[in-house]
Amino acid sequence: MLRKFRALFFLVPAMVAFAQQPSPGPEKPKPPPVPEQKITVSSVHVDGPYIALTFDDGPSEKLTPRLLDLLAQHHIHATFFVIGENIAQHPEIVQRAAREGHEIGNHSWSHPNFAKMSDDAVRSQIKRTEEAISSAIGSRPILLRPPYGSVTMRQKHFIHDDLGYEIILWDVDPLDWKEPGPNIVSSRILKETRPGSIVLSHDIHAQTIQAMPATLTELETKGFKFVTVSELLKLRTPVPPPTPKPVNAPTATPSPVVAPSPNG
């Protein structure tokens, strides 16, 4: 009897202590995924004639310095999406671009098609280029443009959510990589550019550089103001809701008058 009493004496406090332990609450719901339109940016709604010029695939040893000279003459800041392999060969050009107020973005190490690669391979392309940019200019890029604009939805999410990049596409494409001639490159840019546009070009093609003097002058004449992509994103304003169409009140249709029957 004494043994049972001793066992009960130790058991009761243990049961009380267990009962006083806080029970695990329900699991916190995971935050909803970021909508695709907030992960990738092709253009923005702005109050004002602001646009962003972007140049891909450099730096080019001969052409990028010529472009930088021209941009300096016009007091224009642009955004350069650079290739890691090219940075490794010419870090001094990237350093000059950053020093003169241009923005440097990540455009992969060797320009592969992300959508055809494993996630690990994509991460490697991005991180290697990130390290090359950081080594050249002393700061980490925050913008990324996937080569060809090709990237899967899953890749978009980990590039944005895990790696911390804004994914930048474009809404003006002069197809300058096809080298259609400087005049055509210029006319396409002038025709398609609107306030909030992100203009795609490549500073590795001579025709693109040849098209820029007339293009920049005409864009200035049209009243456009040039900013980097990050500056353009900061100028973003909500898109106003569409104006509802006026609803016309239905017109009452008069009832037909029935002639009295002759038969009464």
Can you name each region flagged by the protein language model?
Residues 1-52, 69-79, 195-264:
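Terminal accessory/targeting
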Residues 6, 25, 48, 58, ...:
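Residue-identity detector for glycine
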Residues 10, 47, 73, 99-101, ...:
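Alpha-helical protein-protein interaction elements
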Residues 28-125, 132-135, 139, 234:
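Active-site beta->alpha N-cap acidic-glycine motif
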Residues 78, 104, 142-144, 167, ...:
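Hydrophobic/aromatic residues located in beta-strands of well-ordered beta-sheets
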Residues 88-89, 112-240:
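Catalytic domains of cell-wall/extracellular-matrix polysaccharide-remodeling enzymes
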